[in-house]
From Swiss-Prot:
Swiss-Prot/TrEMBL keywords: Membrane, Transmembrane, Transmembrane helix
Entry's transmembrane regions: 15-35, 476-496
Ranges for region Disordered: 62-116
This protein's name: Protein ST7 homolog
Organism: Drosophila pseudoobscura pseudoobscura
Length: 541
């Protein structure tokens, strides 16, 4: 028969050291995997497995059916929220800045009940690849754009500048391939080939202005040529648009090309300092109706140009039109509204005086506007206050995300600096927003709860050398901290026991004596209080 006492007596201290070291190694591996999973997905792997798999298995099939019913209702409520997105709570705050607004690209789907998805939008102020992004690459040897971002741009260009009527037209088929080409030199070569076949291929001029032109003046020159070609094509297709679906599609394509070229020309004028000309072109474009307008958000270009002109009254008029509860919000709208209200009080604002006498109605209105803007996008103040370095903005942004904050601050930081005291007011008040939002992922104040999908989408949009801003700041789960402590403690014990077996044995005996002493004392007290023959007396009763 197997004798356990004899087996235990044959075990040497090396066995216990090896056992402790093995458990420490396993704990360390679990810790490393858990930390990696948390950094990548923002949640504990063991916690997710426990909630999603182990708990339903322990609770039985009823719990599983309840869970599936609950997720079904969550999905339906999410769909309902999506269909009614612009109606309340600030007109759409989460991921896409309000569901139902056209032009967003679905990036990440979530299971939340408030906002079912995150939308990726075109950056209204996106830079020129050749004249701006390429020069940054030459200076730093760092890629300013990610393949994901450029792939979204290729999809946009194919949507805007192609149609069914392009079939069997060699120049347009070349351009369809050119938009998808990863090599910039090959894209430029394809555009030149398309122009050799047809000198009136406007999309080819657009690609050359975006990528081949090394200065803004060169880009403007190419775009002016493209504008003449686009106007000719537009008039031709306008005359034949009623001849069928294909002809109508060609007219829509030519309209998109014309509007895009005019917008880029206006942006060139803005960059070259021709502010009045740029403002007039942007105003004319905002009066257009085609569906591409909801994607380009040209009113944000107009707002930025008016701020550069310090035409604050005109900015108020633009905000009165677009800062509406039924329209999707953006950092430009929210922070421009805060800037204009701060402008009225910022030059005289003092935190010491305000703490003594309280805030005036105008100061209170400015502070509330700042809190509203910070709730919509909490990443912007770090860039405006220059506590975090700016990089070139991406071609696409995620509303309420770090990418939108970068795009806004990159172009609007100087406007905040132009208003005396505005940054000081922002510095003194912006963190007060978080006291009103103890659980931003669960409940918002003026907007939807902050979407959980922003971090993953921003990591796809922003280059690897940029540290993505995360909100709210995630704390390490208790399990990771516990595992780290247990792993370190057991590894230390194994090392000390291996090096100093006798002292560690005496230490272990002393610790066990200290731990057992309270229990021995409690046992003596109980025996002194209760008589030894208590059971006999109870049996007699």
């Amino acid at each position: 028969m197997w004798d356990s006492s004899m087996f235990l007596s044959t075990l040497t201290p090396k066995f216990y050291v090896a056992l402790t070291g093995t458990s420490s190694l396993i704990s360390g591996l679990i810790l490393i995997f858990e930390w990696w999973y948390f950094r990548k997905y923002g949640t504990s792997f063991i916690e997710q497995v426990s909630i999603n798999h182990i708990s339903p298995w322990i609770n039985g099939n009823d719990a599983q059916s309840d869970s599936s019913n609950g997720s079904g209702s969550s999905t339906s409520s999410g769909s309902s929220s999506s269909s009614n997105g612009g109606g309340g709570g600030g007109g759409g705050g989460a991921g896409g800045g309000g569901p139902g607004a056209g032009g967003g690209t679905n990036s990440t789907t979530t299971t939340g009940t408030q906002m079912p998805e995150c939308k990726v939008w075109r950056n209204p102020l996106n830079l020129f690849r050749g004249a701006e992004y390429q020069r940054f690459f030459w200076a730093t040897s760092k890629e300013p754009l990610t393949y994901y971002d450029m792939n979204l741009s290729a999809q946009d260009h194919q949507t805007f500048f192609t149609c069914e009527g392009d079939a069997r037209k060699e120049e347009y088929e070349i351009m369809q391939t050119a938009w998808r080409e990863r090599n910039p030199m090959q894209r430029i070569k394809s555009a030149h080939n398309a122009l050799e076949i047809n000198a009136e291929c406007a999309p080819a001029y657009i690609l050359l202005a975006e990528e081949e032109a090394m200065t803004i003046m060169e880009a403007e020159k190419i775009l002016k040529t493209a504008l003449k070609v686009a106007e000719i094509n537009y008039r031709k297709s306008q005359a034949t648009q009623h001849q069928g679906a294909i002809a109508d599609g060609m007219h829509r394509r030519d309209t998109n090309v014309l509007i895009y070229i005019k917008r880029r020309l206006a942006m060139c004028a803005r960059k070259l300092g021709k502010l009045k000309e740029a403002a007039k072109m942007f105003r004319d474009l905002t009066k257009e109706i085609p569906s591409i307008m909801s994607v380009l958000n040209i009113h944000e270009n107009l707002i930025e140009t008016l701020l550069e002109m310090q035409a604050y009254a005109d900015c108020h008029a633009i905000l009165a039109k677009y800062d509406d509860i039924s329209l999707p919000k953006s950092a430009t709208i929210c922070y421009t509204a805060a800037l204009l209200k701060a402008r009225a009080v910022a030059d005289k604002f003092s935190p010491d005086i305000a703490s003594k006498r309280g805030l005036s109605p105008a100061e209170m209105s400015a502070v509330e506007a700042i809190h509203r803007a910070v709730e919509f996008n909490p990443h912007v103040p770090k860039y405006l206050l220059e506590t975090k370095p700016l990089i070139l903005p991406p071609e696409h942004i995620l509303k309420r995300g770090d990418s939108e904050a970068l795009a806004y601050a990159f172009f609007h930081l100087k406007h905040w600096k132009q208003v005396e005291g505005a940054l000081n007011l922002l510095h003194c008040t912006w963190e007060g927003t978080f006291r009103m939002l103890p659980y931003p992922l669960e409940r918002g104040h003026l907007f939807y709860p902050y979407p959980t999908c922003t971090e993953c989408a921003d990591r796809e949009l922003l280059p690897a050398f940029h540290e993505v801003s995360v909100y709210p700041k995630k704390e390490l789960p208790f399990f990771i901290l516990f595992t780290a402590g247990l792993c370190s403690f057991t590894a230390l014990l194994a090392l000390l026991t291996h090096q100093y077996p006798e002292p560690m044995g005496l230490l272990a005996q002393t610790v066990l004596t200290w731990i057992s002493y309270p229990f021995q004392l409690l046992k003596e007290r109980v025996e002194a209080f209760w008589p030894c023959n208590l059971l006999q007396q109870l049996s007699r009763v």
